[in-house]
A protein has these predicted regions:
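Canonical Rossmann dinucleotide-binding motif of NAD(H)/NADP(H)-dependent dehydrogenases/reductases
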Residues: 1-23
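Substrate-binding pocket helix/loop in short-chain dehydrogenase/reductase
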Residues: 72-73, 80-82, 180
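Active-site loop immediately N-terminal to the catalytic Tyr-X3-Lys motif
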Residues: 74, 122-128, 150, 187
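Active-site helix of classical SDR
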Residues: 96, 133, 141
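Alpha-helical segment proximal to the catalytic Tyr-Lys
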Residues: 101, 146-150
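Residue(s) in the substrate-gating loop at a strand-loop-helix junction
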Residues: 117
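C-terminal substrate-recognition "lid" of short-chain dehydrogenase/reductases
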Residues: 191-215, 220
Length: 235
């Protein structure tokens, strides 16, 4: 599991361990089981080799490593683009590839679930680079699902909406986050527990691949021509 030291990844790991599963977390944080920078091909291969040597080939991979990037397109610089695309797109591809190669060589098949974002399809002028990186992630999932289906490897994603994690901070004290939360039909931000439930459910869907499950409390249901949305008074 990438990004398993905090946030959504940590909650998925906690739930799996509570159920008696063996979990190996990869992260740049010290609390991870294996230190791994997902943007570094050598580090990914080393983490994969160590995981297999110590625990065998995993059959369920949760890829939740990610970084944020705010700012207007006219103001951002190339290094910000490189950073967010390196982690959210390149890092996802490197870890997906490592997972698929391991399961293919072992002949086990299995499930890969990436944690992406509703930002892949909801344009936000203050988060252009992030939106682009998550759109790339969603398409990587779909292409990988098509390519690796003959190997018995399913590839899906869960796309959270506004979720309370260390990456996001406290929505109540962050104006650009509080706005989307106020427009969420279910009336609150998501929690790592909410997204962990979705991730674990998708792993168990044996005849589903190439899908992106939206877990956003209904945020993406809004129509641009219906600004009141769910708050419209009933007749």
């Amino acid at each position: 599991m990438t990004g398993g030291a905090s946030g959504i990844g940590a909650e998925v790991a906690r739930r799996l361990r509570a159920a008696g599963r063996t979990v190996v977390t990869w992260d740049v944080q010290d609390t991870a089981d294996i230190s791994c920078d997902v943007t570094d091909p050598t580090a990914v291969e080393a983490a994969n080799a160590r995981t297999i040597a110590e625990h065998g080939v995993p059959t369920h991979w949760t890829l939740s490593a990610g970084v944020g990037c705010g700012g207007m397109l006219l103001d951002l610089e190339a290094d910000a683009w490189d950073r967010v695309m390196d982690v959210n797109a390149k890092g996802l591809w490197l870890t997906m590839r490592a997972a698929a190669r391991a399961m293919s060589q072992a002949g086990t098949g299995g499930s890969i679930v990436a944690v992406t974002s509703v930002s892949a399809r909801l344009a936000d002028r203050t988060m252009g680079f992030y939106c682009a990186s998550k759109a790339a992630a969603d398409m990587l999932v779909r292409v990988a699902a098509q390519e690796w289906a003959p190997l018995g490897v399913r590839v899906n994603a869960v796309a959270p909406g506004v979720t309370r994690t260390p990456l996001l901070g406290d929505p109540a004290s962050t104006p650009w986050v509080a706005g989307p939360v106020s427009r969420t039909p279910l009336g609150r931000e998501g929690t790592p527990e909410d997204i962990a439930e979705a991730v674990l459910a998708v792993h168990e869907l044996g005849w589903v691949t190439g899908e992106v499950l939206t877990a956003d409390g209904g945020l993406s249901l809004h129509s641009p021509i219906d600004p009141l949305g769910y708050r419209r008074p009933r007749p």
